[in-house]
């Protein structure tokens, strides 16, 4: 019965590539996008930000990647987390020593934004990576102050100032002496991940790594 229902559902809502929207058979990504997405390569996978030991991103934030992220965040496409998380998981396994990571966490949303959106896209990605690399997911941070959306601020110094005092560690004992992988969807100036890493290290974390789906192209 379930198979019949799934078949009917697939006729009404055929699977589409999460990036270009092309109707496909079973996968979440079409063969063309799989080959031509703006992947980071070599040293461009890595970025260094204050308080972050290593930050990696498999894709550049442009074209179909940018559109997919916007749909994922603002159009209720939470199902995208499976494919986007798989891309990030592969990047983590290729560029980090996942066996040394004690926990995976994410950048938190404010209560209002979480309520309005219905989910935290960074948490969905973090949980996908957690399953793929077999490292537990732990929500270590909480947003305690509403601030102006970082995406509306262009100046790097103002972005850094905008996130100071916005986050707190929920349980310092949990992070003390730990190696933590912090997850977010996109990194631009690095202000948010830097501030979250600062708070985690202030609470006693030994190392904080970061992975995002995409990064700004320099």
Regions found by a protein language model. Name each.
Residues 1-218:
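Glycine-rich phosphate/pyrophosphate-handling loop used in enzymes and phosphotransfer proteins
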